Every structure is written in C-alpha cells, then in structure tokens.
A protein has these predicted regions:
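Phosphate-binding active sites in nucleotide-utilizing proteins
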Residues: 69-114, 118
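Glycine-rich hexapeptide-repeat left-handed beta-helix
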Residues: 108, 114-260
Length: 260
C-alpha cells in the first residue's frame, strides 16, 4: 500500500518533475492512511460544502448533522433542517424546507416544496409539493405541482397529477393518477400479480375511498368514486360509483329536476 510521502520517491525514480506547494491550512496536506484519517478528510470536505451553500443563501440548521454531496445544487432561501442528507445528482429549488430527518437522493425538487422526515429517491417533485412525515417517493415517481403526500405514504414509478392528495397510509405503485384526485387512507394499487408489475390508471377528479384495493391492470374513470373497502378488479367508467368486494357499479340516481 502506498502512502502520500512515497509519491516523492516514486516520481524521482520515474524521472518526473517534483514541485512543492504550500497549503493554506495544515490539514490540506494530511495523509489518508487509515479509516479514521479518511473520516477526518471527509469531515473537512463536508464542512467546506456546507459553508459554500450557507454563503450562497441556504439556511442549514445544525450544520454538523447535515450532509450535502459535492454535485448537489440548492436554491436560495432553502432551509435544510437537522439530520438531512442530500446526495447524488440532486437539485433542490428555492424556498424549500427539507427535514428534519430527510433523505433526498438523485432527485429534482421544485420551488417551495416541503419534505418532512421522508425519503425521496430517483424522482421528480414539482413546485409546491408537500411530502411527509414518514413517507417515501422512489423509483421514477413524478409528483406534479401542488401534490400533497402525507404520513406513511409510498409512491413508486407513478405520476400524480396536479393537486392530487394522499393524506396517509397508502401505496401507489406503477400508476398514472390524474389531477385533483383524493386517495383515501389505506388505499393500495395492487400492482404485482406474482409474475409482472401492472398499471393502474385513475382519471382526474376521482375519489378513492379508504381501504380501496385497486387490482391492476385496472382503470378508474374521471370523477368516479370507490366506496370504502372496495376491491376493484374491473375498469370503472367515468362519473360512476363502485362499492363492495368485488366492487360493483351502483345505479346512477335519476335527476328529478329533469322532465321525462
């Protein structure tokens, strides 16, 4: 194993030019020969990164607990709260609040977003989205403007349209969800049939009742509703309501204001 000072002898032996430089700080010339010295060198690098972003207008609460990779980009007036890790090719917009206890990795976060005690990986989050606490966004998910993802919700490889809400306890996987959809507590898109992943489509303005099971492949039409506890195994037409196990269509109420 080579040590830093060995490089002088190696260069001389190979006839390479040798020059001396004077570092600004002694620790810049510190060797890294043990795991402990590696940790010290990494700590110096992390502190430099944090200082650079704070001088650029990012607020970092409790800096020693916040980790920022060198390739990360942060918008002005964003706040990183304690125990937040931002890694990979991540870009976070302006006026965001990330943390506490959050991980954002290889993701794009728009302006004015809030991510609380949650994990966002390999995903895109547009402007004014709120995630958490205790939620996970992963695997190519795309949350469009104004999406609200509350507590204990997971989104994987899915698109959620503008203004859609999933307040708590849900799994949305391999789904295409339209705008202004309400996804009730306990909803699951049952995407895996034991062999392959299947897609769920939910139209704009739909209302998915609590504890609904959407067994993919399946489509719920625009402005349709599922009753609480429904197991949806067949496509639901637009402007319809289904209930039960398995879910069945309810007859539409006659509009008494219209003459026959």
């Amino acid at each position: 194993a080579w040590k830093l000072l060995d490089l002088v002898a190696v260069a001389a032996h190979q006839g390479l030019p040798i020059e001396s430089i004077e570092p600004r700080f002694g620790y810049e010339a510190q060797g890294v020969n043990t795991r402990a010295e590696l940790a010290q060198a990494e700590a110096v690098l992390r502190e430099r990164i944090r200082q650079r972003w704070m001088l650029a207008g990012v607020t970092i609460s409790d800096p020693p607990s916040v980790y920022i990779d060198s390739e990360v980009e942060l918008g002005q007036d964003t706040v990183l709260l304690p125990n937040t890790h931002v890694s990979g090719s991540t870009r976070i917009g302006r006026d965001c609040e990330i943390g506490p206890n959050s991980i954002v990795s290889n993701s794009q976060i728009g302006d004015r977003c809030k991510i609380t005690a949650s994990v966002v990986e390999d995903s895109t989050v547009e402007e004014e989205v709120e995630v958490g606490p205790f939620s996970r966004v992963r695997g190519g998910a795309h949350l469009e403007r104004g999406v609200y993802l509350g507590t204990h919700a997971e989104v994987k490889n899915s698109r959620l349209g503008p203004g859609t809400k999933s307040a708590h306890f849900s799994f949305i996987g391999d789904a295409d969800v339209g705008a202004n959809v309400n996804i009730g507590a306990g909803t699951v898109t049952c995407n895996y049939d034991g062999v392959r992943k299947n897609k769920t489509t939910i139209g704009e303005g739909a209302f998915i009742g609590s504890d609904s099971m959407l067994v993919a492949p399946v489509e719920v039409g625009a402005r349709s509703s599922t009753g609480a506890g429904s197991v949806v195994t067949k496509d639901v037409p637009s402007d319809s309501t289904v209930v039960g196990v398995p879910a069945r269509l309810l007859p539409k109420k006659r509009d008494r204001s219209k003459k026959e």
